[in-house]
Amino acid sequence: MFLPSVLAASNLVKVQPGLIFWTLVTFVIAAVVLKWKAWGPILSLVEEREKQIASSIESAKRERAEAEKLLADQKTAIAEARREAAEMMRRNTQEMEKFREELMAKSRKEAEELKLSARREIDEQKAKAIAEVRSMAVDLAMEVAGKLISERMDDSKQRALAEQFVQGLPLNSTSATGAVRRTA
């Protein structure tokens, strides 16, 4: 309602062929001037911006690829370092075990040698003690036999004489090694 009355009153909405012509001429002149003076610089700015964006994208891709490569290299280096550390620990454990076994074998050997040496010494002392006791027994038997032969006696006198002779001998005691020692 209101719109048709406004449109009817206005001269701007009326189609006027002269106005259309001059509007088209002005538009074409403006388009030619813009194309001639402004279109080139605008297009070059747009192209330059496109190149800059493409360059930034390529640079970002390269940097990302480089970062991924560095990350992979670091992961590989860390894995290698862990592997080397594990190998070193394994080697050290083996060497420590070998050293412990060698030390135990050496200790056993030394203990066995000490044991054998002590046993030899004990056997020597025992042999000396037995030889000494035998020598004393022979001497005693010879003395008793000599006295018995020199004096003919009855059994009670012989026993008394043997006891008297034995009492005159120095006392003997046996040590822990089995050796006989004379004491006063």
From Swiss-Prot:
Coiled-coil region: none
Gene Ontology cellular component annotations, sorted alphabetically: plasma membrane; proton-transporting ATP synthase complex
InterPro entries in alphabetical order: ATP_synth_b/b'su_bac/chlpt, ATP_synth_F0_bsu_bac, ATP_synthase_B_chain
Subcellular location, record wording: Cell inner membrane
GO molecular function: proton-transporting ATP synthase activity, rotational mechanism; proton-transporting ATPase activity, rotational mechanism
Membrane topology, as annotated: Single-pass membrane protein
Superkingdom assignment: Bacteria
Transmembrane segments: 15-34
Key words of the record: ATP synthesis, Cell inner membrane, Cell membrane, CF(0), Hydrogen ion transport, Ion transport, Membrane, Transmembrane, Transmembrane helix, Transport
HAMAP family: ATP_synth_b_bprime
Binding partners and assembly: F-type ATPases have 2 components, F(1) - the catalytic core - and F(0) - the membrane proton channel. F(1) has five subunits: alpha(3), beta(3), gamma(1), delta(1), epsilon(1). F(0) has three main subunits: a(1), b(2) and c(10-14). The alpha and beta chains form an alternating ring which encloses part of the gamma chain. F(1) is attached to F(0) by a central stalk formed by the gamma and epsilon chains, while a peripheral stalk is formed by the delta and b chains.
Family membership noted in the UniProt record: Belongs to the ATPase B chain family.
Function: F(1)F(0) ATP synthase produces ATP from ADP in the presence of a proton or sodium gradient. F-type ATPases consist of two structural domains, F(1) containing the extramembraneous catalytic core and F(0) containing the membrane proton channel, linked together by a central stalk and a peripheral stalk. During catalysis, ATP synthesis in the catalytic domain of F(1) is coupled via a rotary mechanism of the central stalk subunits to proton translocation. Component of the F(0) channel, it forms part of the peripheral stalk, linking F(1) to F(0).
Name of this chain's protein: ATP synthase subunit b
Biological source species: Myxococcus xanthus (strain DK1622)
